[in-house]
Amino acid sequence: MKNILQSTECLEDQQNVSIRPNLLDEFIGQSSVVNNLKIFINAAYTRKEPMDHVLLYGPPGLGKTTLAHIIAKELKVNFRSTAGPLLSKAGDLAAILTNLQAKDILFIDEIHRLNRNIEEILYSAMEDFCLDIIVGEGCGARTLRVDLPKFTLVGATTRIGLLSNPLRDRFGIPIHLEFYSTEELIKVIQRAAKVIKTDISDSGAQEISLRARGTPRIALRLLRRIRDFIEVTEHNKTITDTFADKALLRLGIDKLGLDRQDIQYLKFIHDSNNPTGIDTISSGLSEDTGNIEETIEPYLIKINFIQRTPRGRVITQKAISYLKEQSYI
């Protein structure tokens, strides 16, 4: 029997648990988001009411799961976690909802992957805090309404466009997470280095931040890998910019944070000489379209290396110049 309340986090996020901030005051970056959340949380706590439903959306690795945990801790309520793909039947969701307590946080990761039948059950649960269950079959079928405790649903998605309008509109607090600045990532890296007891110079932290694609999860992953290198190969245990650069090059991460997958993607579009559709790119690279749209493209769009047009993806002159400069083409 599957566990629909099992951890929804990838192994990488589980490794980051010891580094994860527990309170909003410890959370680095996303300052406007943090400031607004403090208001919403304090208001709900003061009124002794459940917080309104929250939708966290943005590229992977920016702290959606971390913020969901923090909301529960700040409100001093229970945290329940599941994921859209785990909820395949109406009974799966009903089992979770009927076991919630008042003001609990229910976190649904990858909420865009809920099937429509499950979504429809959520409508009344979110709006009226009730669950309509059909009992019996055929002419003898009847609807049984079950009252639910007033809870807070926190949904997380990397693809908000895949959410239906009725579901999206039921979230009273939509929150968009942005890519991090270099300065913010440096703080993330320095804080993490202290937690994992690794010495790092300011220049070393900056070198990692410049290649972390504006994403804390990537910054922490690179920090751990560089720590592996320095513990095995160096007597001086301080991560400097020079050592970080050498280690990252060995990992196949260039000075902009691009890896082999990114370069293959850019070269494929460049060699096509025309706007290229996502399905064509997926077929040519043997990559899932979802992975391309969620993992590869957001950062390339941010740094103005590609553009999405109605006719397909187009590589920019800035990207072409970079590919030539680095001898990729």
From Swiss-Prot:
Residues where ATP binds: 19-20, 61, 64-66, 127-129, 170, 180, 217
Binding site for DNA: 308, 313
Subcellular location field: Cytoplasm
Pfam families attached to this UniProt entry: AAA_lid_4, RuvB_C, RuvB_N
Class in the EC hierarchy, top level: hydrolase
Positions of Mg(2+) binding: 65
Known partners and oligomeric status: Homohexamer. Forms an RuvA(8)-RuvB(12)-Holliday junction (HJ) complex. HJ DNA is sandwiched between 2 RuvA tetramers; dsDNA enters through RuvA and exits via RuvB. An RuvB hexamer assembles on each DNA strand where it exits the tetramer. Each RuvB hexamer is contacted by two RuvA subunits (via domain III) on 2 adjacent RuvB subunits; this complex drives branch migration. In the full resolvosome a probable DNA-RuvA(4)-RuvB(12)-RuvC(2) complex forms which resolves the HJ.
Protein name: Holliday junction branch migration complex subunit RuvB
Record organism: Ehrlichia canis (strain Jake)
Gene (name only): ruvB
